[in-house]
Amino acid sequence: MSDFILELLSEEIPSRMQKQASEYLLREFRQQTEGAGLEVGQIQSFYSTRRLTLIATNMKSQTAKMTVEKLGPRIDSPDDAINGFLRSNNIKSIDDCDILDDKKGKRYRYIETVPAKMAITILPPIIEEIIRKFSWPKSMRWGNGNSRWVRPLRNIMAIIYENNSVNKLKINVEGLLANDYTFGHRFLKNQKIYIKGVSDYFEALTNHLVIADQGQRRELILEQISKIEKKFDISVIKDEKLLEEVSGLVEWPVALCAEFDEKFLNLPDEVLQTSMRSHQKYFSVAEKKTKNLTNKFILISNIQTSDEGNSVILGNQRVLSARLYDAKYFWDRDIDQPLID
């Protein structure tokens, strides 16, 4: 048995497209391998802002040897029909066929022996076809060819791990050749990582500041938010859709608590939350007892800084302040303008 790892590393994938793309990759791989007669145990897919990963474990190293029955025309059929059957099935001579006597009468039959094929030769054309025909809501051409991807594709890692040995697949998509390595966090640890197996994949990426499992990133964000809630005695307003979105925007999530000027609390909650959630992807914060909004908010950063996030906090506070000044201007103007003159 062997394991297979495929990672497609690209520029940032929009968060809203990641889950659908991951499911498509898994579904296509399963259908293609089943069609090729390659037995695979468990297939899982993972996604992040830059990666689509597929892992197949307990995969057979080769397909089973098979025999395929091909039924031809009746023995009294015209020569053109018989010769057409031979040509379409690459049969050298009618002598290679036997005669089957069934309800339709006597007809020619050819028994083809299909030899076993190695997984390392079956998978490359499958992966190339999946990549070339990948279904994206929106896509762009990249490189010098005609292939399309949601953002430029930068690296393909495709390896089979068997008997403590790593074998790289020979894949070529518009000149982009498959490798046996990936890369760490784009800004924090952008180094080559040679992968030695499934367990090593996740561990090696974590050591290079990438959480490849979307579920693990989600749980990590929740844990960090919970610690902030206890530290500041606040209650972060639950937002599952926002949580799902920000989990797809980062590879190394760092939750930080920031704040805005209290004077903006005079704005309606809906205005504040729209400015924070829709525009900036921030979590709103309420007081534990009163449930009223506070001037604090939670942001999820994709980098870990040496100043404990202070520079990131200040930058985000400036951006939100500008948003809230705009919101206050339009709100005040609407208040001054009566509905009926």
Region locations from a protein language model:
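Function-dense linear segments that define catalytic or interfacial modules
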Residues: 284-341
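Long, basic N-terminal domains or extensions that often function
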Residues: 1-292, 302-304, 319
